[in-house]
């Protein structure tokens, strides 16, 4: 699903709202999440999940074309951890979070 499809679905479920207003709301929510992450804050949507940023330290990498060693600078990357309700909905009837693949 892409953002425009999300806007269409939300607008269809809420016929009392104009499509333009739904689009503005979706954009505002995404902008607030982005701004919070850019400020180094964590955004938690209970039951759905939590957005945060993690630091990837600098390291040596390899250019896949040439095989040359290259320096990869430190960077911050977005990270999403699913909430319990989302995990349960995706995996109905699944046991605890512990992975017992034995």
UniProtKB/Swiss-Prot annotation:
Keywords (alphabetical) are: DNA recombination, DNA-binding, Transcription, Transcription regulation, Translation regulation
Entry GO CC = chromosome; cytosol
Q: Which GO terms describe its molecular function?
A: DNA binding; structural constituent of chromatin
- InterPro entries (alphabetical): Hist_DNA-bd, Histone-like_DNA-bd_CS, IHF-like_DNA-bd_dom_sf, IHF_beta
Which PROSITE patterns is this protein grouped with?
Answer: HISTONE_LIKE
CDD domains linked? IHF_B
Q: Which GO terms describe its biological process?
A: DNA recombination; regulation of DNA-templated transcription; regulation of translation
Signal sequence annotation = none
Do the record's keywords include Transcription?
A: yes
Record's keyword annotation contains Transcription: yes
Q: How does it assemble?
A: Heterodimer of an alpha and a beta chain.
What is known about what this protein does? Answer: This protein is one of the two subunits of integration host factor, a specific DNA-binding protein that functions in genetic recombination as well as in transcriptional and translational control.
The family classification in the record reads: Belongs to the bacterial histone-like protein family.
NCBIfam families for this protein:
hip, PRK00199.1
Q: What is this protein called?
A: Integration host factor subunit beta
Origin species, per record, is: Rhizobium rhizogenes (strain K84 / ATCC BAA-868)
Name the gene that codes for it: ihfB
């Amino acid at each position: 699903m892409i953002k425009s499809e999300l806007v269409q679905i939300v607008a269809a479920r809420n016929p009392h709202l104009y499509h333009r207003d739904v689009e503005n709301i979706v954009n505002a929510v995404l902008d607030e999440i982005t701004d919070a992450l850019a400020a180094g804050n964590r955004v938690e949507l209970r039951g759905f999940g939590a957005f945060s940023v993690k630091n990837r330290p600098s390291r040596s990498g390899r250019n896949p074309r040439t095989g040359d060693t290259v320096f990869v600078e430190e960077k911050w990357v977005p990270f999403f951890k699913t909430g319990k309700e989302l995990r349960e909905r995706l995996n109905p009837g699944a046991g605890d979070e512990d992975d017992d693949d034995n």
